[in-house]
């Protein structure tokens, strides 16, 4: 079907207007063009244009979507609702056509693609409860409205794709979202990744029933679009691109990672809605970079579902209860059973062991043990004790395939990959029969492991059996590289890989491997792992990069009572996020053996706030006590960071009791985004610790009464807090009055960060305190505080009178050139003591640089100026560079990121490099510098009198010639920040 717009055209609509209406349309059109700041069309041309001429003029001067948007807006102003409704009916026609197509696709093609074995599950009628569940998925609990971005989190195999399929099917049948969405488009990230480059229009066209997708029409109502993005983890995009790299053109081809970032970071189609499925690890990696309005968790099987499944598999009810209790008491194994296919694996594995007359307790020791038992049983006939040579070769080939997949992020394998790793065509049917492999629905003759975790354990077995140099793929790296990659969470799809390696080193697992493969394993692997852990223990920088939870699971799976304290007593800093009860158990298991810690950073999210049955709560609190015990067992612990955590009263009291212990000598306490479901006074009792020097409460909600309690502590003579950070704590202007007494009376407080609070009217109170002769504050951060014009006069007075304030950050406020002029009036005074000024994102233009230049020429104390993300342009930089060359200027660092600069300003910058004897660093990232400009900068830096280090250049932002030039310069000077 051709596009609705090309079928009926603008002229068709304009023909519906009478002569008087047509003239009115032209007048409103001129107003609309001016208001939108669009390319001008002369009134003479518009006035004399016929309906056909005017339609052609609009389509010639503006893109089709913009022309139609303006036309519909003018129709609305003219009260021609009938024309709007007619367009809506035509658009709805396409929507209905698409719904019919989607339903057909879901019940046929997608049933295979989503690995749904029983298509009847898609043909069943949806109940009202089903529909309510789907609708609620896209309703925010906080606002009750439709959110723009919903993340559906869940581990692999939990059923996310099936849930999305059913939701789309319900929409295609007209049962949900009928007044909300005209179109729902499904993008499978496996398919998107294969495309390498694509436009959004291309992705939509692939989903359309024929070759002529009405793209302009579909995109004309972006608020009526829902994009379902499935398996985001496959894309491996971290959303870290600069804003300038993102794209807002739906028709433009981009690398698919850029396209995905542009959609999810709301650069493209910000009015549309998104439902995104991903693993928890993926969401954790990108949550700070996207505006996610809702997060939904898919929990999988609950306890009763797991119990029902076990009872359906075992005949003896008493024996079943025994087996289920064994699983339920092992929290790690119980968590595995929440994934349906893994629940089947665990249950069938235990059943086989019982049938063979073995004790199931031993294989439930750790999950590594259960996985290896399950896999080895697949290759050993029921009546045999040992596998055949063929079975050994098949498993060895399978493990080689798994390792290649883990290192290349491959989870769907073509037959060629199987052959490359020693799996013969004749072996495939056997591997399918035992259900360790399944046919993939992605493409013909391709295969997947039953579950990604089975691929991980097979890959781990490969590394225990052979060296990476024996693998047919060079992508497979050493055991050392594996461990560091796992512990640093470089590859987010590696969930168990590293911990399985450690688990396989347990004596019982070594015996199983040796029995299956018929030869003794080398102890070299164990030595290499020990060496890795020794490297970590002796390297503070490396410890900062290690994910504590990954390390804990490795040590837990290894289950070596002698080795555990050796490792833990070498750690000086640990950071971890516990997301469930299992995580807390494993963290407690390791941390109670640690006595050398200096810094601990933790998050327990909602685990310690949820109401649970009594026995569960008691066990959880015991584990939490063991976690907190590190605060008293480690005699040198100075830093505690608690983030993104909700505490009930009992849980907080456990932490409180350890922090109040006399041997706890904290100097730094950070409590960020923490909610106390108890009396907040307990928190403020903690900060009365006289050893405390830094307190960070940012992102933690503080009531007015909380602020009073905080300031009461700060006003105490015994308080030694030098640095206070209360950014984004929901502070109000009235709270500023409470801080007045602290600023005047405290002789210790030197740094105060109040950023991201709405303080506008409170600045007058703060300023009076800052002007007081007893105020000793040195650093003040007021970034993103919604400051208005009046505030600049108050702060100007502070800069004139305060003789201790050396750093001021007022970034992300509407300072503008006028406000900057007021501040610069104070900064040009000869007795100004300010050393550092940050005015990023302050709407400063070229004009404001005149006042900054005057400051640089007169203020000999200013060393650091951060002016990034202001449109100062080349002319503004010229003014600054001329001032930097002045003998009175002692500037050392300047930040000019994203200042709309071009290569034309580089000569001025180069000149300042060679004339200013104090300038050490300049950041120019996110500016459109060209080859000749960069050559000029690097030539200047080669001069003997130049001390400047250029920062922020990213090689990939330039053309090939410039990239080669930068690489050559980097080779000459490895210290360059490129």
Swiss-Prot record:
Protein's UniProt keywords contain Nucleotide-binding: yes
GO BP annotations, alphabetical order: inflammatory response
Residue stretches of each LRR repeat: 594-617, 694-717, 746-773, 802-825, 859-882, 916-940
Superkingdom of origin: Eukaryota
Residue spans crossing the bilayer: none
Gene3D superfamilies tied to this protein: Death Domain, Fas, P-loop containing nucleotide triphosphate hydrolases, Ribonuclease Inhibitor
Keywords linked to the UniProt accession: ATP-binding, Inflammatory response, Leucine-rich repeat, Nucleotide-binding, Repeat
InterPro entries in alphabetical order: DAPIN, DEATH-like_dom_sf, Leu-rich_rpt, LRR_dom_sf, NACHT_NTPase, NLRP_HD2, NLRP_innate_immun_reg, NOD1/2_WH
Pfam family, any one: NACHT
CDD domains in UniProt: Pyrin_NALPs
Gene Ontology molecular-function annotations: ATP binding
Positions bound to ATP: 154-161
Start and end residues of each Pyrin domain: 1-93
Residue ranges of every copy of the NACHT domain listed in the record: 148-471
Family: Belongs to the NLRP family.
Protein function: May be involved in inflammation and recognition of cytosolic pathogen-associated molecular patterns (PAMPs) not intercepted by membrane-bound receptors.
Protein name per Swiss-Prot or TrEMBL: NACHT, LRR and PYD domains-containing protein 4E
Organism of this sequence: Mus musculus (Mouse)
High-level lineage: Eukaryota, Metazoa, Chordata, Craniata, Vertebrata
Gene: Nlrp4e
């Amino acid at each position: 079907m051709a596009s609705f717009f090309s079928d009926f055209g603008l002229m068709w609509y304009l023909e519906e207007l009478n002569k008087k209406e047509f003239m009115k349309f032209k007048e409103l059109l001129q107003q609309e063009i001016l208001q939108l700041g669009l390319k001008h069309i002369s009134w003479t041309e518009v006035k004399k244009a016929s309906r056909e001429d005017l339609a052609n003029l609009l389509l010639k001067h503006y893109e089709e979507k913009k022309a139609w948007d303006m036309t519909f807006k003018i129709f609305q102003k003219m009260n021609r609702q009938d024309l709007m409704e007619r367009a809506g009916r035509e658009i709805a026609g396409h929507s209905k056509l698409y719904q019919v197509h989607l339903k057909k696709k879901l019940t046929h093609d997608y049933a295979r693609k989503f690995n749904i074995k029983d298509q009847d599950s898609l043909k069943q009628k949806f109940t009202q409860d089903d529909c309510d569940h789907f609708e609620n998925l896209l309703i925010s609990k906080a606002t009750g409205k439709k959110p723009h971005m919903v993340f559906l989190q869940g581990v692999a195999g939990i059923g996310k794709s099936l849930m999305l399929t059913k939701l789309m099917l319900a929409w295609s049948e007209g049962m949900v979202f009928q007044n909300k969405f005209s179109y729902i488009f499904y993008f499978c990230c496996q398919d998107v990744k294969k495309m390498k480059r694509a436009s959004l229009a291309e992705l939509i066209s692939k989903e359309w029933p024929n070759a002529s997708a009405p793209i302009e029409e579909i995109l004309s109502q972006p608020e009526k679009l829902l994009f379902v993005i499935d398996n985001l983890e496959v894309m491996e995009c971290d959303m870290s691109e600069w804003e300038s790299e993102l794209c807002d053109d739906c028709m433009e081809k981009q690398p698919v990672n850029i396209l995905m970032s542009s959609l999810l970071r709301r650069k493209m189609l910000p009015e549309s809605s998104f439902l995104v499925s991903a693993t928890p690890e993926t969401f954790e990696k990108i949550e700070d970079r996207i505006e996610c309005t809702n997060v939904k968790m898919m929990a999988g099987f609950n306890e009763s579902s797991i119990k029902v499944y076990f009872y359906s598999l075992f005949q003896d009810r008493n024996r079943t209860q025994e087996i289920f209790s064994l699983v339920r008491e092992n929290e790690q194994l119980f968590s595995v059973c929440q994934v349906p296919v893994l629940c089947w694996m665990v249950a069938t594995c235990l059943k086989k062991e019982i049938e063979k007359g073995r004790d199931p307790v031993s294989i439930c020791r750790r999950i590594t043990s259960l996985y290896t038992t399950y896999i080895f049983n697949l290759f050993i006939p029921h009546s045999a004790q040992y596998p055949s040579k063929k079975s050994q070769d098949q498993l060895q080939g399978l493990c080689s395939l798994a390792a290649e997949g883990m290192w290349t992020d491959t989870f769907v394998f073509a037959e060629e990959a199987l052959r490359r790793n020693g799996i013969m065509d004749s072996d495939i049917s056997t591997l399918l029969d035992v259900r360790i492999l399944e046919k993939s629905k992605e493409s013909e003759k391709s295969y997947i492991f039953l579950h990604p975790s089975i691929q991980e354990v097979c890959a781990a077995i490969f590394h225990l059996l052979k060296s990476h140099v024996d693998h047919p793929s060079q992508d497979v790296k050493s055991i050392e590289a594996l461990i560091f990659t796992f512990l640093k969470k470089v590859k987010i799809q590696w969930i168990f890989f590293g911990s399985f390696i450690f688990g396989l080193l347990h004596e019982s697992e070594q015996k199983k491997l040796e029995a299956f493969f018929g030869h003794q394993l080398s102890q070299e692997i164990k030595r290499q792992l020990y060496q890795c852990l020794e490297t970590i223990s002796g390297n503070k920088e490396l410890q900062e990069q290690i994910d504590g939870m990954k390390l804990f699971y490795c040590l837990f799976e290894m289950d070596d009572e002698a080795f555990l304290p050796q490792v833990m007593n070498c750690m000086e800093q640990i950071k971890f996020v516990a997301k469930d009860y299992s995580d807390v158990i494993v963290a407690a298991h390791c941390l109670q053996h640690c006595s050398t810690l200096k810094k601990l950073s933790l998050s327990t999210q909602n685990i310690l706030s949820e109401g649970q049955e009594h026995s569960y709560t008691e066990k959880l609190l015991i584990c939490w006590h063991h976690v907190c015990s590190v605060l008293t067992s480690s005699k040198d612990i100075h830093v505690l960071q608690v983030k993104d955590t909700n505490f009930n009263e009992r849980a907080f009291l456990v932490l409180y009791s350890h922090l109040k212990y006399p041997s706890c000598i904290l100097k730094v306490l950070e409590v960020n985004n923490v909610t106390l479901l108890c009396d907040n006074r307990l928190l403020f009792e903690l900060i009365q610790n006289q050893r405390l020097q830094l307190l960070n409460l940012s992102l933690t909600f503080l009531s007015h009464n909380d602020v009073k309690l905080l300031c009461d502590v700060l006003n105490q003579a015994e308080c030694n807090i030098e640095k206070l950070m209360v950014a984004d704590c929901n502070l109000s202007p009235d709270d500023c009055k409470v801080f007045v007494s602290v600023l005047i009376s405290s002789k210790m407080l030197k740094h105060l960060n109040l950023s991201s609070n709405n303080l506008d009217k409170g600045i007058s109170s703060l300023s009076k305190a800052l002007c007081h002769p007893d105020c000793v504050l040195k650093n003040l951060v007021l970034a993103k505080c919604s400051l208005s014009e009046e505030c600049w006069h108050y702060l100007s007075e502070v800069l004139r009178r305060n003789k201790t304030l050396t750093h001021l950050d007022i970034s992300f406020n509407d300072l503008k050139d006028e406000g900057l002029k007021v501040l610069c009036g104070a900064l040009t005074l000869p007795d100004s003591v300010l050393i550092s000024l940050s005015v990023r994102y302050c709407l400063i233009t070229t004009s404001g640089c005149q006042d900054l230049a005057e400051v640089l020429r007169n203020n000999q104390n200013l060393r650091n100026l951060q002016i990034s993300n202001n449109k100062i342009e080349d002319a503004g930089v010229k003014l600054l560079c001329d001032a930097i060359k002045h003998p009175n200027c002692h500037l050392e660092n300047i930040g000019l990121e994203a200042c709309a600069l071009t290569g034309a300003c580089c000569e001025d910058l180069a000149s300042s490099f060679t004339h200013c004897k104090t300038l050490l660093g300049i950041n120019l990232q996110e500016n459109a510098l060209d080859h000749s400009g960069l050559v000029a900068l690097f030539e200047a830096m080669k001069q003997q009198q130049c001390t400047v280090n250029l920062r922020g250049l990213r090689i990939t932002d330039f053309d090939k010639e410039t990239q080669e030039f930068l690489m050559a310069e980097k080779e000459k000077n490895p210290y360059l920040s490129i």
